[in-house]
From Swiss-Prot:
Chemical reaction(s) catalysed: 2 [molybdopterin-synthase sulfur-carrier protein]-C-terminal-Gly-aminoethanethioate + cyclic pyranopterin phosphate + H2O = molybdopterin + 2 [molybdopterin-synthase sulfur-carrier protein]-C-terminal Gly-Gly + 2 H(+)
Keyword match Transferase: yes
Record protein name field: Molybdopterin synthase catalytic subunit
Organism annotation: Salmonella typhimurium (strain LT2 / SGSC1412 / ATCC 700720)
CDD domains: MoaE (cd00756)
Lineage: Bacteria, Pseudomonadati, Pseudomonadota, Gammaproteobacteria, Enterobacterales
Amino acid sequence: MHETRIVVGPAPFSVGEEYSWLAARDEDGAVVTFTGKVRNHNLGDSVKALTLEHYPGMTEKALAEIVAKARSRWPLGRVTVIHRVGELWPGDEIVFVGVTSAHRSSAFDAGQFIMDYLKTRAPFWKREATPEGDRWVEARDSDQQLAKRW
């Protein structure tokens, strides 16, 4: 049985609880997770806060499509994608991606694929608060290059 959890919202999440849910399937020998956090700097400037916005409904649909594409490429068990929105502070967790599979190679590849596609294809917008004022975060070419490998 394949299970997917996709959550987009302002609430914090527990990495431990998410891992426990993923690891509960005895059929899977591999659990791979990634947790992204707000950094206190970007582009050489101090970052005081990060505001994430999304397009409700469209964002969840895009994430579901990314997970479906990963499932079509690798034999996966459970998949979790959580992305926070709203105002966050340095050190806060932003995103969690977790995947399970019978073997590590599929789990690692699928986790990277989901994260690379999330960064380039899911409709999220970031605004940083810096000492010099607020600014929108532009898409990075390096993220596009990583997504192209798939």
